[in-house]
UniProtKB/Swiss-Prot annotation:
Residues spanning the membrane: none
Cellular component GO terms, alphabetical: cytoplasm
Protein name from the UniProt record: tRNA(Ile)-lysidine synthase
Any single biological process term in GO: tRNA modification
Record's keyword terms, sorted: ATP-binding, Cytoplasm, Ligase, Nucleotide-binding, tRNA processing
Domain-related comment: The N-terminal region contains the highly conserved SGGXDS motif, predicted to be a P-loop motif involved in ATP binding.
Organismal lineage: Bacteria, Bacillati, Actinomycetota, Actinomycetes, Streptosporangiales
InterPro entries registered for this protein in UniProt: Rossmann-like_a/b/a_fold (IPR014729), TilS/TtcA_N (IPR011063), tRNA_Ile_lys_synt (IPR012094), tRNA_Ile_lys_synt_N (IPR012795), tRNA_Ile_lys_synt_subst-bd (IPR015262)
Membership in a protein family: Belongs to the tRNA(Ile)-lysidine synthase family.
Residues annotated as binding ATP: S33, G34, G35, P36, D37, S38
Organism for this UniProt entry: Thermobifida fusca (strain YX)
Length: 324
């Protein structure tokens, strides 16, 4: 008897690899929008999970941003039940405005996924991000001047969130969804030039492919993997250094900092700023560099203004971040 078509076999293998270390009897939830990536993920999980002794459930989130979104969420929930998923949750969310429409929708979606996973005590939540999504994320963060940790982009595992398709190209995943008999929904936001990611996908990446040659998507995703390894090593070094120069959660010894490489200093300075209450999304590299100048270019200068009504200052040989 012949096996499944290659794209279907590939996505099943990717899901099997992601789930194989989970304890038997664990519940895994598939986040499904009804698009081709998440439908392929749902189909592969429906096949793989029971063969690994796992329970499969699903969750679909209605952001309420488009006409007909409620009916579409109902359709996706019914499809997941037909695949044998149990439980299946259909969650409606209210999308705010903080950080722009894409970021606000993402925040609302992840909050819903987290709550659903908590309620059902899920061991893992599966997300359908592909290698192409990874490449787009790298470009978006590169344009913001991000560091190694941010450029490392998405991990195959972040806490309970698993991304089985992160090493699989989008075309293969879409072929798998079609071969499984799904009729995916096409999100108009994915082709709307008002959204930055859409412009990267349909304008920037094709230009890079034409100018630099094929393989740019794979190269960007590979860069993310390499940078993740580097960032992990630097974070571990920073952990060790903090034990030596830390003076509580929001202060560091200035002389000890001065003897460390800049990559380690800036990590530690960012940590104390966050611990003091600076909002992560508002704390930029320039803020951290200004704190670093209190170490490397100390001339008795004044404090550094930071987001969240916080200040960084040098006092009694320490770099301290506190409220105004």
């Amino acid at each position: 008897m012949s096996g499944p078509p290659p794209p279907v076999a590939l996505v099943r293998t990717a899901v099997r690899r992601a789930l194989r270390d989970l304890p038997a009897g664990s519940l895994v939830l598939v986040a499904c929008s009804g698009g081709p990536d998440s439908l392929a993920l749902a189909g592969a999980t429906a096949f793989v999970a029971p063969r690994l002794g796992l329970r499969a459930g699903g969750v679909t989130v209605d952001h309420g941003l488009q006409e007909g979104s409620a009916e579409r969420a109902d359709t996706v929930a019914a499809l997941l039940r037909n695949l044998g998923f149990d439980p299946v949750e259909r969650v409606s969310v209210t999308v705010g405005t903080a950080g722009g429409p894409e970021a606000a929708a993402r925040s609302a979606r992840y909050a819903a996924l987290e709550k659903t996973a908590d309620v059902h005590q899920a061991a893992a939540v599966l997300l359908g991000h592909t290698r192409d999504d990874q490449a787009e994320t790298v470009l978006l963060r590169l344009a913001r001047g991000s560091g190694a940790r941010s450029l490392a982009a998405m991990a195959t595992r972040t806490g309970r969130y698993l991304r089985p398709f992160l090493d699989v190209d989008r075309r293969t995943v879409h072929e798998a969804a079609s071969l499984m008999g799904f009729e995916p929904w096409s999100d108009p936001h994915n082709t709307d030039p008002a959204y930055t990611r859409s412009r990267v996908r349909h304008e920037a990446l094709p230009v890079l492919e034409r100018v630099l040659g094929p393989g740019i998507t794979e190269a960007l995703a590979r860069t993310a993997t390499l940078l993740r390894d580097d960032a992990d090593a630097l974070d571990a070094w920073a952990d060790q250094a903090q034990q030596q120069v830390g003076r509580g959660p929001t202060a560091l010894d200035a002389a000890g900092l001065a003897g460390l490489p800049r990559a380690i200093r800036t990590r530690l300075l960012r940590r104390i700023a966050l611990a003091a209450g600076c909002p992560a999304g508002a704390l930029t590299a320039e803020h951290v560099f200004a704190l670093d100048r209190l170490v490397t270019e100390w001339r008795g200068q004044s404090h550094v203004d930071l987001p969240g009504a916080r200040r960084g200052r040098r006092h009694d040989g320490q770099i301290i971040v506190s409220a105004d």
